[in-house]
Amino acid sequence: KYSTMIYNIYLKYVAPEDMHVYSIDEVFMDVTDYLGIYHKTPYELAMTIIQDVLSQTGITATAGIGTNMYLCKIAMDVEAKHIAPDKDGVRIAILDEQSYRRKLWDHRPITDFWRVGRGYAKKLEEHGMYTMGDIARCSIGREDEYYNEDLLYRLFGINAELLIDHAWGWEPCTIADIKSYKPERN
């Protein structure tokens, strides 16, 4: 019930093609094209939407603002937890690639990061890597050094590519990519 109500509030601000429902209580929005329309910064637009949700449902929200979907997710899941809530309990965190590296490259535990579970963490720890900064530094190691991109690919196969991207705060997938995806038919 509340999930539908909240989604309908989002639709007042953003078209469905610019939203990706990630879970029952989590939505990604690409608001890039809306900032000029509403004459708002990303923070101001997030606060407007959150205040609308709060006034209509009584539910307080947290928002993560980022330059890509990964940074939005990390801003919400990791960074927002360290921000004091406002008078309504709202927390909004903002990350770009530089602030991510500055604030979170040394963050522990590494399992706080999207798509890094206990299995990945254990493999990384066995090779002396405990943070996203460690992964990023490993990815640029020279060929003749132990810590280099090849080590990550040996440990994680093709999944190393996304792990390396995320270590640097990069995310190649966009909401438009998700919306345009068509699964292959057998």
Residue ranges and their predicted role:
Residues K1-I24, F28, D165-A167:
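Residues that scaffold, gate, or flank divalent-cation-dependent active/transport sites
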Residues M5, I9-Y13, T48-T57, K123, ...:
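Generic non-transmembrane alpha-helical segments
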Residues F28-I50, G128:
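Catalytic palm subdomain of template-directed nucleic-acid polymerases
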Residues D33-K40, V90, L104-D112, Y120-E126, ...:
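Flexible, glycine/proline-enriched loop segments at strand-loop-helix junctions
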Residues L45, I49-T111:
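Long, highly charged, low-complexity intrinsically disordered interaction regions
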Residues D112, Y120-N186:
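DNA-contacting surface of Y-family translesion DNA polymerases
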